[in-house]
């Protein structure tokens, strides 16, 4: 016969949610930092190609 599982405590649920949110926050910070370095032209570890269309638009 099927038996329902025990309920997860509020504290355990809150800890898991906090860990998940912190991982998302770290990814957000890293992506924003990379975007800033690309826009300012100081990126050392990220290489990308520019096309003629892009360079004509900036002039």
Curated annotation (Swiss-Prot):
GO terms for cellular component: chloroplast; large ribosomal subunit. Keywords: Chloroplast, Plastid, Ribonucleoprotein, Ribosomal protein. GO terms for molecular function: structural constituent of ribosome. It is found in: Plastid, Chloroplast. Pfam families: Ribosomal_L32p. GO terms for biological process: translation. InterPro entries: Ribosomal_bL32 (IPR002677), Ribosomal_bL32_plant/cyanobact (IPR044958), Ribosomal_zn-bd (IPR011332). Signal peptide: none annotated. Belongs to the bacterial ribosomal protein bL32 family. This is Large ribosomal subunit protein bL32c. It comes from Physcomitrium patens. The gene is rpl32.
């Amino acid at each position: 016969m099927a038996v329902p599982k025990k309920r997860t405590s509020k504290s355990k649920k809150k800890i898991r949610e906090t860990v998940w949110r912190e991982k998302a926050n770290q990814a957000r910070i890293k992506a924003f930092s990379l975007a800033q370095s690309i826009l300012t032209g100081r990126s050392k570890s990220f290489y990308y190609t520019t096309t003629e269309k892009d360079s004509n638009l900036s002039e």
